């Protein structure tokens, strides 16, 4: 972070300039450009799409057909208006392919239970953090109107590239 008085480069977040002692607390610590978009943007800015919702009692073959039909890499498992789990293509491959017949598999056995859910007014940085730390490629989003959206890693990349 550059001091506005003497121009010395200081460490990000420094309270006092190393060169002249200027009070740096009044200098904006927000990065410019890409970093600023990540810190200041909200998930609503990413325009999450509607989630594809199934129930925990739905059959695995019917869920696979729905995912293919909708060209979606994941579905949310919702019962009683509450997100109970998320099922991704990766879950299907690791849980079914070569292990058990899809007709014999149960959705609750394959899904990730109680996924992290964010809100539309959360910062974009929350989505990056949760996806990075959790190794997720999809995050459910609770909308202000009570609906449920879905955010993907592709949505984050699209946001950053605009």
Positions of the model-derived regions?
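Tandem CBS (Cystathionine beta-synthase) repeat/Bateman regulatory domains
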Residues: 1-162
